[in-house]
Regions:
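Periplasmic-binding protein-like
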Residues: 49-56, 131-155, 161-164, 269-301, ...
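Short helix-initiation/N-cap motifs at beta->coil->alpha
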Residues: 83-101, 114, 224-245
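An extracytoplasmic/periplasmic, membrane-proximal ligand-sensing/linker region
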Residues: 30-54, 58-69, 219, 299-356
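C-terminal motif of bacterial Sec signal peptides marking the signal peptidase cleavage site
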Residues: 15-18
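Beta->alpha turn/N-cap motifs
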Residues: 54-56, 94-96, 106-119, 124-125, ...
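Pocket-lining segment of extracytoplasmic ligand-binding domains
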Residues: 182-189, 194-302
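A conserved helix-loop-strand patch within extracytoplasmic ligand-binding domains
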Residues: 133-205
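Bacterial signal peptide processing site
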Residues: 20-23
Length: 356
């Protein structure tokens, strides 16, 4: 699969969307220093429907089940703030980029996006919240510190605004060879990594593509995922399943994806040993800024200061309830904080780095 061609075409499409003609993306026509349309001060209070969309970083059926009551909770909170919302439709996109494109087109009103996806589509969408999450007791940058039952990842009560991406070697014969080198304190070479069969995520996925590419560039003198010989694009569940089946040597994921697939590793996928012993971390990325909640700029009733403030307050309030914690726990989000576009300048720089 030619990852480079896909990433270039996505960037081109995003730029075309961002520069296209048509109606103004908001009632206000004023623009900021970067040419982005600024939100109007206010908009209408009666809104027939809203469309929320989540990205498929977890299995779609699990996301739909977890978020099934979010619409009702949101409508009630907005009612307290003077808004009458008719209905809230919740869906899961086919890919990260599909959610970004839907926001850009205005066919989706709100989306939960990784920082890298937001950075690519921020000409026509605006971040309003950033996720917070509980960190881990282990925050090491040394990959071997993450491996084995003795180093099983444990959650911390400390909230953090970042997470790490992890590069894992699976239990295939070649994956075990790579893990043995890392656990012995040896550095992996480009030749070592290029011989492996890799599985990655969409090209705007922070932990599934962008930051692993930056890790490769740092380790291998500028080489990235697009330079690897054997790469396939899978969702996270398929990555772990194919690693368990020894069909893939290296997978990439957020820290620590092994928590999400620990039971399946042995009960469903037939592995005899634990995921902590068999799926070894061989690389740790830089810190990734947390996921976003982003609104479209295409609809004046959405893209105005009054609505966005009410939206921010409502989601934050929901996230503090027991039911809200369960809903957003599907993404390991422990809460939300108000955000601004400039918070994701680093994500834009990272995105540019992987396109070189």
């Amino acid at each position: 699969m030619n990852i480079k061609k896909i990433s270039v075409s996505l960037l081109t499409a995003a730029l075309l969307v961002g520069c296209g003609s048509g109606k103004s993306s908001a009632a206000n026509t004023k623009k900021d220093a970067n040419g982005r349309v600024l939100p109007a001060d206010t908009g209408k209070k009666d809104i027939d429907s809203l469309k929320f969309q989540f990205v498929p970083s977890r299995p779609t059926d699990q996301i739909i089940k977890a978020t099934s009551n979010l619409g009702n909770l949101f409508k009630a909170k907005m009612k307290e703030k003077g808004y009458n919302i008719g209905k809230v439709d919740i869906s899961v996109s086919d890919s990260y980029e599909a959610a970004g494109e839907a926001l850009s087109a205005g066919s989706v009103d709100v989306a939960w996006l990784p920082g890298g996806t937001y950075a690519l589509y921020s000409n026509d969408s605006d971040v309003v919240l950033t996720a917070t999450r509980h960190g881990f007791k282990n925050d090491s940058t040394n990959p071997k510190d993450w491996n084995g039952d003795a180093n099983k990842t444990q959650n911390s009560d400390k909230p953090v605004t970042y997470y790490k991406g992890l590069i894992y070697a699976g239990p295939s014969a070649y994956g075990r060879k790579l893990a043995a080198k890392v656990n012995a304190g040896e550095k992996l070479t480009w030749e070592d990594l290029d011989k492996a069969k890799w599985a990655v995520r969409d090209v705007t996925s922070s932990a599934g593509y962008i930051y692993p590419t930056m890790w490769l560039q740092e380790q291998c003198k500028g080489k990235g995922i697009k330079d690897l010989s054997k790469v396939t694009t899978l969702n996270y569940a398929a990555e772990f399943q194919q690693a368990a089946a020894e069909q893939i040597d290296i997978i990439v994921c957020y820290a620590d994806g092994r928590q999400d697939y620990e039971k399946q590793w042995q009960k469903e996928w037939g592995r005899k040993d634990s995921i902590w012993n068999e799926l070894n971390v061989i690389g740790v990325t830089q810190n990734v800024y947390n996921d976003t909640v982003t609104v479209t700029m295409k609809k004046p009733e959405i893209y105005n200061k009054e609505f966005m403030t009410a939206f921010q307050d409502s989601i934050i309030e929901i996230s503090k309830t027991e039911e809200g914690k369960k809903i957003f726990g599907i993404y390991k989000h422990s809460g939300y904080a108000k955000a601004s576009d400039k918070d994701y300048d680093g994500a834009r720089q990272a995105l540019k780095a992987v396109q070189k």
